[in-house]
Amino acid sequence: LADHNARAAAGSRVELSIAVLEKGSEVGAHGISGAIVDPRSLRELFPDKFSAIPFEAEVGREHLWWLTQEKALSLPEPPQLKNHGNYVASLGKLVKWMAKEVAALGVDIFCEFPGRTLLYEDTAAGKGRRVAGVRTGDKGIGKDGKRKSNFEPGVDIRSQMTVLGEGPRGTLAKQLDSRYGLSAGKNPQVYALGIKEVWELPQGRFEPGEIWHTMGWPMWPDHFGGGFIYGMQENFLIVGLVYGLDYENPLDDPHLEFQRLKTHPSIAQLLAGGTMSYYGAKAIPESGYWAMPKLGGDGFCLIGDSGGFVDGQRLKGIHLAVKSGMLAAESIFAAALAGKPLSSAGDAYPVHFESSWARQELWKSRNFHQGFERGGFDAMVNAALGTITGGLGFGLFDRLPAEAGHERLRR
């Protein structure tokens, strides 16, 4: 869309006004450092500037460990976990670089503008109401809920098309789901907690781009998840744990399990003499294709985690989030070229997704997470048979049912 505007400025087309609302104090404020990025969508988005993207390093040495409480057994990586050709990246650095690129093309970025509620208006055909923009949150509200001297009321930002990339369980996306039933007939979305720490270690402890993934202790066989360690530049190391929130025991503590993971002899040896610099955590939508909500409608699109664009089998979602944004933009661009209302792109966007490589990737892992409801051993069998059969559950079923995470909790 920004490229369309650049050409429109030359007089060939009507220019569109594009704005990004960022709830953080700056772009990247909510991006937790350290991730492995499949570069496919970024190569498509920045074909002439790909070499300028500030990745930390291309993935080099890869390790997969099966952990017992005292030992680390090296395993061969299954196809889904092989990362040759992928990159270790700081998500904060990546999105800041992208923000500069789009700002240079005339996109307005407004930081510290959280969306509080959606705006609606009657459709021209009189067949209901469409999304017509966002009302931002008030500023200058005290802890007691009263207005302070610096109070500023929220503003109404009207738009023909509203694209929501709020992450999992976003405020506005939940409003849309409640109003339009976007998740009707879908599997329930199940979440995991991704916990990360950034460590600064002595020189020579690891190579930038060196990565580890762990299975087994301290979670096996009752919990979905595993550990990860990524080597970055300047002796910084990412260590983290993905912990499924669909556990049965109400006393489970994901943060405590992460601390236990770091006491494993092989990991403790890696971290010895280092300093923990940063900490963060975020929710991850893990249920896959069958839990994705309806992705668009009159005046709106859902992208990234808001739309469930995560491949749990590959442990990746950034490239899918980028591709979902591209598909939404292409749908809006097509509506503009055809002289149609931009709001109509919300219906075209899901169709474009279904014919994209992003859909093909998510289709292959459509039954991956459901296998973990039956325990770790069944999950491994399901994953292996799904790989052979193109994603069939246990090699037989096109769609495995799923339980919401809270329904599995013992009371």
Model-predicted regions and their roles:
Residues D3, G11-E15, A19, K23, ...:
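Predominantly flavin-linked oxidoreductase catalytic cores and closely associated redox partners
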Residues H4-R7, G11-E70, L172, Q360:
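N-terminal FAD cofactor-binding segment of flavoenzymes
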Residues G11-L16, G308-R314, M326, E330-A379:
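Active-site-proximal substrate-binding core of FAD-dependent oxidoreductases
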Residues E26-S33, P39, E44, A57-K93, ...:
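Redox-cofactor-proximal catalytic regions of oxidoreductases
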Residues P54-V59, L64-T68, A358-R411:
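Ferredoxin-type iron-sulfur electron-transfer modules and their immediate structural context
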Residues V88, S306-H319:
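Glycine-rich phosphate/pyrophosphate-binding beta-alpha loops
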Residues Q269-G280, K340-G346:
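Flexible, glycine/charged-enriched surface loops at secondary-structure junctions
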Residues A281-G312:
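FAD-binding beta-loop-beta segment adjacent to the flavin cofactor pocket
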